[in-house]
């Protein structure tokens, strides 16, 4: 061999120095690194070089140096052992595991009871049994997540966020796989849909489509929205929340750990804050965050319900004589068609808060649109405490509200024109009756529902019972 190399002047693989070969192998993926074991004895020896497997352990399994030291195994052994356990999820594991780790790290000091409610991961045989029970394959990223944590115990507050109004409370638990299987839908309108979450107060669930059916894409996550104008119970519209389980779960976690969703009284509230939605007038700053409530909204008839949370703060550096009291509010409300409504009234949510240097006042209220989006803006009128005759206005920044993407039920698309027109007329009559009976209400942050305790056994029974009951969507009056 050496004579051949001397004559030709070529280097063979066997004669290359070790360091360049190890450098080349450090760029090889784990599959090719394994295949190198079968190419030659030299490459087989080099591919067992333990530092080569360190990168793959960190990339695919997020194994840390501390975990390696605790298990007292080499990197290659750790990779192989983990692959033997969850190898089928190698394309999803890192993203899902990171989301779980980030979420728990963020919630442990803020919502410890919520973290304690998480269940241990399910076994492969448990997930296989559920697939046999429902007659459908579960998405791999869903299975991967449930190998890490099999949902949570039925507690309030739920892991998937809360929302509270004066007469309405929602808190969504992440279902364990057995309970989810019990709520698997075979009926028309929700065929092949598996519930991911459940709220014991409203009966609301987010679903994942495990098969493509009735106009849904496979693996889509959505809120169901019954068509209230259709006589066909299979007419169920959908608010799309995520294209896949990974998309749905990781985007939610990112909103939580980035501080996008505020933690209030040990609960995650699903308000979204636009950093540009802030206005400062003198020493007073007003900021707004908003949230869409699918359980109080409908596509047919068009009724989109939003709640907003307003924070009013006076700078700590303001002079004491700048202390003031809110007298009134003015709103200019514009829908997607450009229709404008103006509202003016005393105080906010029945209160006349006093703002002084360093003090923060927050409140929540809500509004509805007949279009899928709209915006609000306006101002507050204050008077100084020490100069009561002196009044001034504080700007409320324009804030936009838009419902998620929705998909209309196939049952509606298959309706005849005569049936559609008849239902439109009936809906308009009902809307007029509701408008005649409705009255303005106000709702304060003081009325946010306190932490709720629920018996897990009773909760499980109720959760299974409600799965087969269509959600009743109540109309709430607009609050300004």
From Swiss-Prot:
Domain ApaG: 278-408
Self-association state and partner proteins as the record states: Part of a SCF (SKP1-cullin-F-box) protein ligase complex SCF(FBXO3) consisting of FBXO3, SKP1, CUL1 and RBX1. Interacts with PML, interaction is direct and takes place either alone or within the SCF complex.
GO biological process: protein ubiquitination; response to lipopolysaccharide; SCF-dependent proteasomal ubiquitin-dependent protein catabolic process
Pathway membership, UniProt: Protein modification; protein ubiquitination
Annotated CDD domains: F-box_FBXO3
Purpose: Substrate recognition component of the SCF (SKP1-CUL1-F-box protein)-type E3 ubiquitin ligase complex, SCF(FBXO3), which mediates the ubiquitination and subsequent proteasomal degradation of target proteins. Mediates the ubiquitination of HIPK2 and probably that of EP300, leading to rapid degradation by the proteasome. In the presence of PML, HIPK2 ubiquitination still occurs, but degradation is prevented. PML, HIPK2 and FBXO3 may act synergically to activate p53/TP53-dependent transactivation.
Protein name: F-box only protein 3
A single GO molecular function term of this UniProt record: ubiquitin-like ligase-substrate adaptor activity
Chief localization: nucleus
Gene3D superfamilies hit by this protein: 1.20.1280.50, ApaG domain (2.60.40.1470), SMI1/KNR4-like (3.40.1580.10)
Residue spans of biased composition, Acidic residues class: 419-459
Protein keywords: Nucleus, Ubl conjugation pathway
Pfam families, A to Z: DUF525 (PF04379), F-box-like (PF12937), SMI1_KNR4 (PF09346)
Transmembrane stretches, start-end: none
Location(s), subcellular: Nucleus
PANTHER family (UniProt xref): F-BOX ONLY PROTEIN 3
Leader peptide range in chain numbering: none
CC terms in the record's Gene Ontology section: cytoplasm; cytosol; nucleoplasm; nucleus; SCF ubiquitin ligase complex
UniProt xrefs under PROSITE patterns: APAG, FBOX
Domain F-box: 10-56
Ranges where the record places region Disordered: 419-464
């Amino acid at each position: 061999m050496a004579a051949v190399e001397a004559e030709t002047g070529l280097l063979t693989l066997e004669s290359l120095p070790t360091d360049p070969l190890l450098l080349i192998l450090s760029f090889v993926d784990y599959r090719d690194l394994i295949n190198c074991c079968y190419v030659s004895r030299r490459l087989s020896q080099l591919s067992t070089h333990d530092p080569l497997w360190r990168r793959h352990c960190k990339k695919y399994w997020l194994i840390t140096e501390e975990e390696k030291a605790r298990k007292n195994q080499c990197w290659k052994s750790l990779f192989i052992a983990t692959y033997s356990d969850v190898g089928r999820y190698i394309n999803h594991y890192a993203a899902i595991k990171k989301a779980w780790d980030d979420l728990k790290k963020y919630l442990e000091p803020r919502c410890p009871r919520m973290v304690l409610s998480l269940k241990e991961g399910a076994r492969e045989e448990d997930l296989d049994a559920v697939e046999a029970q429902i007659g459908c394959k579960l998405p791999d990223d869903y299975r991967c997540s449930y190998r890490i944590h099999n949902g949570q115990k039925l507690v309030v507050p739920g892991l998937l966020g809360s929302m509270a109004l004066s007469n309405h409370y929602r808190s969504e638990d992440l279902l364990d796989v057995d309970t989810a299987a019990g709520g698997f839908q075979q009926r028309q309108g929700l065929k092949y849909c598996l519930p991911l979450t459940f709220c014991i107060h409203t009966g609301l669930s987010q679903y994942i489509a495990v098969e493509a059916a009735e106009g849904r894409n496979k693996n889509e996550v959505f809120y169901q929205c019954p068509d209230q104008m259709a006589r066909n119970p299979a007419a169920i519209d959908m608010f799309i929340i995520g294209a896949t389980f990974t998309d749905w779960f990781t985007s939610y976690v990112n909103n939580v750990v980035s501080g996008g969703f505020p933690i209030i009284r040990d609960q995650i509230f699903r308000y979204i804050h636009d950093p540009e939605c802030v206005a400062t007038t003198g020493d007073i700053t007003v900021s707004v965050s908003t949230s869409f409530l699918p359980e109080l909204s409908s596509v047919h008839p068009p009724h989109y319900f939003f709640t907003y949370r307003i924070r009013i703060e006076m700078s700590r550096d303001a002079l004491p004589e700048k202390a003031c009291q809110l007298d009134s509010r003015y709103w200019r409300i514009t829908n997607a068609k450009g229709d404008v409504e103006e509202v003016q009234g005393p105080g906010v949510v029945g209160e006349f808060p006093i703002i002084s240097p360093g003090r923060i006042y927050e409140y929540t209220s809500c509004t509805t649109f007949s279009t899928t989006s709209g915006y609000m803006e306006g101002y507050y009128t204050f008077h100084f405490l020490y100069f009561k005759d002196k009044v001034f206005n504080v700007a409320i920044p324009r804030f936009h509200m838009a419902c998620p993407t929705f998909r209309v039920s196939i049952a509606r698309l298959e309706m005849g024109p005569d049936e559609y027109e008849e239902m439109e007329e009936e809906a308009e009559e009902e809307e007029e009756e509701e408008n005649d009976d409705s009255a303005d209400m106000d709702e304060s942050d003081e009325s946010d529902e306190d932490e709720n305790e629920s018996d897990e056994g009773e909760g499980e029974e109720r959760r299974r019972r409600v799965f087969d009951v269509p959600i009743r969507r109540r109309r709430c009056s607009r609050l300004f």
